[in-house]
Regions:
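N-terminal capping/lid subdomain adjacent to the active-site entrance of alpha/beta enzymes
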Residues: 1-125
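Catalytic core of soluble alpha/beta enzymes
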Residues: 83-236, 240-264
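Expand to "…catalyze enediolate/carbanion chemistry for C-C bond making/breaking, isomerization
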Residues: 272
Length: 272
């Protein structure tokens, strides 16, 4: 990119025959365990997608009857309605549950899991809901099959929730396997697990080709530079959303990803 006096996203777009996005990619902010205080930060900043929530324990975060997460979704909805500056602000509620719904109801009890997802979707209204990692089947083939069957149950019943595949969907090969089988409505594309950055680009483009949502994720443990490079890939491939990273404090990850995206748009706009 430097040798050609071009932006990284422009080099990636040329390589894959795409067009760099002329608008911001929705940014997904993650709260860590400060899921209440950080949710307020996200709402006040106008986060596109929030709050992640780190729902990784049945007893303390999901509840033995799913009541704790249900209460949190209701609180989050009410908080957005109270704090939003404009009524047009309609963020997506995206919660990562780390397989805890499957632990509670049983990985293969798809009707029971769908019943619970329906309650969550109702509590989230009027906001759209995404649930990441509803179950963890302990191996790739079973995970793919369980995600596909739960998605089919959700779609059959018309439940307004998107399922996001995470566990066991790590490499480019895994992404293609899950996308081919429609094992979820959206796949998280994890930058660290994919090796070279070209694999991230190809995974996003493959999901788009298959009609599957492409969430360009990663980890809170990346560097600021890796996050900036990921922004260029997301803009070149037009991912559906990108994770604010690194860190779990909301401000730092959002600042790095948001500013890099704005820089791309400003520099390209100046040339137009």
């Amino acid at each position: 990119a430097h040798s050609k006096h071009r932006l990284m996203c422009e080099v990636v777009a040329e390589e894959y025959g795409t067009a760099v996005s002329d608008r911001m990619i929705p940014i997904f902010m993650q709260s860590g365990d400060s899921r209440y205080d950080n949710a307020d930060k996200m709402i006040l900043k106008g986060a596109d997608v929030l709050p992640h929530g780190l729902i990784n324990n049945v007893d303390t975060k999901l509840g033995r009857h799913g009541e704790k997460l249900l209460d949190y979704v209701g609180w989050l909805r009410d908080r957005i309605l109270k704090l939003r500056v404009m009524e047009t602000y309609q963020p997506v509620l995206h919660l990562d549950v780390y397989g805890t719904i499957g632990i509670l109801f049983g990985n293969e009890h798809f009707a029971a899991m769908a019943d619970y997802l329906e309650k969550l979707a109702e509590a989230a209204k009027p906001f759209h809901l995404r649930i990441e990692g509803p179950m963890d089947a302990d191996e790739r083939e079973r995970q793919m099959a369980d995600m596909r069957l739960l998605r089919e149950e959700v779609d059959r019943r018309g439940i307004p929730v998107e399922l996001v595949a995470d566990e066991w969907c790590n490499t480019l090969e895994d992404v293609k396997y899950f996308a081919d089988n429609k094992a979820g409505h959206m796949l998280q594309i994890k930058t660290p697990d994919l090796g070279g950055i070209q694999n991230t680009a190809e995974a996003v483009l493959y999901c788009r080709e298959k009609g599957i949502g492409a969430y360009q994720g990663g980890t809170c443990n990346e560097t600021d530079r890796s996050a900036q490079v990921c922004v260029h890939v997301a803009m070149a491939t037009r991912a559906d959303q990108i994770l604010a990273k690194p860190g779990m404090g909301v401000d730092e990850g959002h600042m790095i990803v948001y500013n890099e995206m704005r820089r791309i748009l400003a520099l390209r706009g100046r040339r137009a």
